[in-house]
Amino acid sequence: MAQVETPPQTQQRTPGRPADPCIMVIFGAAGDLTRRKLIPALYNLAKAQLLSREFAIVGVSHNKMSDDEFRKKLGDDIHHYAGNDVDPDIWEWFTRRLYYVTAEFDDKNLYSQLKTKLEKLDKDHSTHQNYFFYLATAPRFFGQIVEELSAAGLMDEAGGQHWRRVIIEKPFGHDLESAKALNQQLLSCVSEHQIYRIDHYLGKETVQNILAFRFANGIFEPIWNRRYIDHVQITVAETVGVESRGSYYDTAGALRDMVPNHIMQLISLTSMEPPISFRPDAVRDEQAKILHAVQPLSSEEVLTRTVRGQYGSGVEGGQRVPGYRQEEDVPPDSRTETFVAMKLAIDNWRWADVPFYLRTGKRLAAQTTEIVIQFRRAPFVLFRDTPVENLMPNQLVLHIQPQEGISLQFAAKVPGPIMRLGAVDMNFNYADYFGTQPSTGYERLLHDCMIGDATLFQRADMVEAGWCVVSPVLDVWKALPPRNFPNYPGGSWGPKEADELMERDGRHWRNFDR
């Protein structure tokens, strides 16, 4: 057995439990996700001393490479994607734990070959036969890979003597029926507790902070209901277009790509009831309850409560940008939406008559993900002689990206001899207060998988509940193809119909300049 080395210690340990000894197997290891997100996140965990000393990584892809070529390829990228100075000693320790297997995912021989390799590496690195498999592949391979892993005995936990887990990237199905079918396929060969359906948004500090903000502060939870909240807005806006993902995106669209996963998770954390504890299933039970309480839209409501759009050419950051139909690998007559806005309702006591407005899109005016809690207006009877009709209601904004933080807008007297009100902000920024930039989210999620904490991962029932909300919209949109695409210029806030969706209710989106 090889001597176990400890990662070089160059800084104080980050608080938290070190990961269990294990081997991580990345299917799709030659892809962008591995070099841009996974390897930098694992390096950051090593630097923070949150990786076990007994650790190794095996990359699997059809690209032909040796171990050394794989290490060099990742070494060339790490300085660009790690986001900070790379410590050469830590990186050297890390690269000695990188291995590579060249194979096609549908080659049955791969899995017996992989089992032999893992058994050897387990002895070399003392990883206690703990393995987890990250499926950074096309969705069509998800079920087949897990079936083959199970058939090879690689998902067998030997009665709890060791653990075996699998992380699955989105998209998890392309509609409700395919999501159910994939869940059934997976659960026919592994247990639910072994499946970690990942959504990297849930690894972000502000998303995790939603529960702490709500339930650890006595001043907010008592007013977190229909008596005090007028409505909720959720915006996930991107300034970029589809870039090199045209062929994938054109088969998915903004609705499938963002709503049943990212946005439904944000809705659940914002609106769920207090869990009995922070144990994984206690939290996820409450999330599942609220997702099942989101009312699916009728066919008539789809026509009045949803908006779809597609970006045309425009100006982004002072530069002319092409329209969606001019992007690489996109058909010139594509009817795929790049923008979605919806008005949803939650059918329970806490949120009765409180609309949830959501929007997401590409080539919008600003890069931002945020949750806006807009409170009901105060009675301005005391200020009847003061111009208050243009004063914004109180807003609590949870900024998720790019700058993570929380802000509260409220009214205050403007200095001067007369009573005049103005809107002011109280701002909390993670980077300013804690002196560090929050991580990408993958660090937290990978670490959670290695310690067996599934709180921030979706269960089968949560995935299916998200698709239940989206499916009626997909059906109506398929029956009634759009006739006015493209209908918003790149660099704008989307089609005018999205503004009208809220204006009909006497409300407005929270828009701002970049």
Across the structure, where does each feature detected by a protein language model lie?
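Secretory/organelle targeting and membrane-embedding segments
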Residues: 1-168, 172-514
